Amino acid sequence: MNAQTGIVHLVGAGPGAPDLLTVRAARLLARADIVFYDALVHPETLALAERAEKIAVGKRCGKHSTLQRFINKRLIDAAHKHAVVVRLKGGDPMLFGRAQEEIDALQAAGIQCEVVPGVTAALAASADLKISLTRRGMSRNVTFVTPRVGEGEDASDWIRSACDADTAVLYMAAGQAASIASTLIDHGLPADMPVLIVENASLPQMTTMATTLDALRSITERMTHGGPALLMIGRVFQREVDAQDAMSVDDAVLELLAIPLSA
């Protein structure tokens, strides 16, 4: 490493709640000279970098964001000017965060880098819901997958991964939930497979909808409100679907009781 270059720290900001940030991440933010942050980073987390210059670099699914090659260049340029450079990413940097592209670019430029892990949304949702993603006799494996396919990638890869998993968590998928449900059923998953749609995991405004693949593929209205959302699929979520069905029956009974008897 050139003696005049700083270190770039790829830091996981966690799933949203500021108090789920790691101690190491908080200490780095306090020392940072400059922070390049993603769209989903909580303002209270960003506020920990009191002395740092803060630069938004987008990276929100489906919306305008800074091109990755420009982010890479800005990180390299910043390392030549500052001692502590933080690249702050939602969740964990190494999971759907394009961290490897940044690491490769930094190493090619002779810049030292460090990765600080963060709590990913799937684990935050599991904790909030008090539902283990693995369960003896039911789920021996968990797959984290995204249906977003890049140039040269085969869509069948993510489909196969989701279908083979005991428990599958799909990131960046809520906007196409109905078509995903149809695709998974067409490729062999049971129509009654439980699904949870979890939005804003770890935050006070977190919402959860329990359903099945069959019901999900028939839903046409928007199911989320713009926050980061997960599709969580597997038999470990059966209890939540059963509870939702019971509530639906109770609501139907109440509606019937409210109908006045005809004369």
Stretches with model-predicted labels:
Residues 1-116, 215-217, 229:
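Class I S-adenosyl-L-methionine
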Residues 45, 106, 125-126, 180, ...:
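Hydrophobic packing residues within well-ordered alpha-helices of enzyme cores
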Residues 53-59, 110-114, 133-140, 188-197:
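Short hydrophobic/aromatic-enriched beta-strand-loop microsegments
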Residues 55-67, 135-146, 168-169:
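Acidic/glycine-enriched edge-of-secondary-structure segments
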Residues 94-164, 207-210:
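Class I SAM-dependent methyltransferase SAM-binding "motif I" and its flanking Rossmann-like core
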